[in-house]
């Protein structure tokens, strides 16, 4: 093999190696930023991983919103997909459109049976429902009617709120 051909071969091999490394880094970065969505039933059945960032969505159960008396930023509420209910704790300012009987998607981590949210997103008008929540409700054959607060029995005292650290 002559020198010119060897140089071309080396250049092609280094280029391919660089491309493979670049693709591997992109795949790794995308994997780290992916938040998997779980509805309340999947979370209640234990399908959601513990201490891994996920997205949870559903409707806020009427009568479930509780604020800590000594910490106005500490909020507990429950989300439902009309089959199961999951308690959520959140430390921070809720969006202005957050309300009972409305759709939310929260990003956070499961800690035991409680979803500790680091971010809560609320619907942006009365007709909007997050796509994941709408799909979950459709799969559960629900029309969008919100269950009554009698179906949710909040704990008598607030759970200890843990701040999500990312």
From Swiss-Prot:
Stretches the record annotates as Disordered: 133-166
Biological processes, Gene Ontology terms: cytochrome complex assembly
Record topological domains on the Cytoplasmic side: 1-8
Binding site for heme: 124, 128
Membrane topology: Single-pass type II membrane protein
InterPro entries, per the entry: CcmE, CcmE-like_sf, NA-bd_OB-fold
GO cellular component: plasma membrane
GO molecular function (one): heme binding
Biased composition annotated in UniProt, kind: Basic and acidic residues: 156-166
Keywords, ordered alphabetically: Cell inner membrane, Cell membrane, Cytochrome c-type biogenesis, Heme, Iron, Membrane, Metal-binding, Signal-anchor, Transmembrane, Transmembrane helix
Periplasmic side: 30-166
One Pfam entry name: CcmE
Residue ranges, compositional bias (Polar residues): 142-152
Transmembrane segments: 9-29
Location in or out of the cell: Cell inner membrane
PANTHER family membership: CYTOCHROME C-TYPE BIOGENESIS PROTEIN CCME HOMOLOG, MITOCHONDRIAL (PTHR34128:SF2)
Family according to the record: Belongs to the CcmE/CycJ family.
Function: Heme chaperone required for the biogenesis of c-type cytochromes. Transiently binds heme delivered by CcmC and transfers the heme to apo-cytochromes in a process facilitated by CcmF and CcmH.
Name by which UniProt lists this protein: Cytochrome c-type biogenesis protein CcmE
Native organism taxonomy: Bacteria, Pseudomonadati, Pseudomonadota, Gammaproteobacteria, Moraxellales
